[in-house]
């Protein structure tokens, strides 16, 4: 697990590097599917002092199997998503400013241009709010459940992120680094959408044919963007 712990540590350290977190407001995890184990950031440990050895390993029930610290308080959310979506290899949660603003407003981040379409096939959805019973019960688990309720059976890697109403963004990817990459993009397109709608409140969504072209040339079966 040392290699995965190093990967998760590096991905967590990318959060402050890319301006996605303030203090300890974020976490990254990755899963070893063969072993059924997840590596995640320890709860409340400052990035300035954190080391790869501090990463916490949990099983799919959330039991700590390796590590001196308690795992992130959002661990149950991560585990619920891993259980539901086998294509996920890494998950990120932050409170990045612009994506969180859309979450607090209770609005999906609209797909307005090609930057968005290069990564997200459609709007980045916003979940419903959790009920008082859901919050007072198993809050973090229920956060995962409301994300799954919103995504349904859609391929999560086609829309690799979501904003949880009144909470903040979650992003995911093939591994921890890919998840962070998608979290960075989500924050950028959230900012772009806010600015664009401020300039033109009547702005429509990107044309579907342009969205299809940009997404499929990077992610479709005949993708040709980048190098092989």
Curated annotation (Swiss-Prot):
Cofactor binding, note field: Binds 1 zinc ion per subunit.
Family matches, as InterPro entries: Aldolase_class_II_sugar_metab (IPR050197), Aldolase_II/adducin_N (IPR001303), Aldolase_II/adducin_N_sf (IPR036409), UlaF (IPR023499)
HAMAP family: UlaF (MF_01952)
SMART domains on file: Aldolase_II (SM01007)
Chain residues that bind substrate: 26-27, 43-44, 72-73
Molecular functions (GO terms): aldehyde-lyase activity; L-ribulose-phosphate 4-epimerase activity; zinc ion binding
Enzyme class: isomerase
Pfam families, A to Z: Aldolase_II (PF00596)
Taxonomic superkingdom: Bacteria
GO CC annotations, alphabetized: cytosol
Statement: the UniProt record of this protein carries the keyword Zinc: yes
Factors inducing expression: Induced by L-ascorbate. Repressed by UlaR.
Zinc keyword on record: yes
Annotated residues for binding of Zn(2+): 74, 93, 95, 167
Keywords: Carbohydrate metabolism, Isomerase, Metal-binding, Zinc
Transmembrane segments: none
Homology family: Belongs to the aldolase class II family. AraD/FucA subfamily.
Gene behind the chain: ulaF
Pathway assigned in UniProt: Cofactor degradation; L-ascorbate degradation; D-xylulose 5-phosphate from L-ascorbate: step 4/4
NCBIfam families: PRK08193.1, PRK12348.1
Designated name of the protein: L-ribulose-5-phosphate 4-epimerase UlaF
Active site: 118 (proton donor/acceptor), 225 (proton donor/acceptor)
E.C. designation(s): 5.1.3.4
An individual GO BP term: pentose catabolic process
Function summary: Catalyzes the isomerization of L-ribulose 5-phosphate to D-xylulose 5-phosphate. Is involved in the anaerobic L-ascorbate utilization.
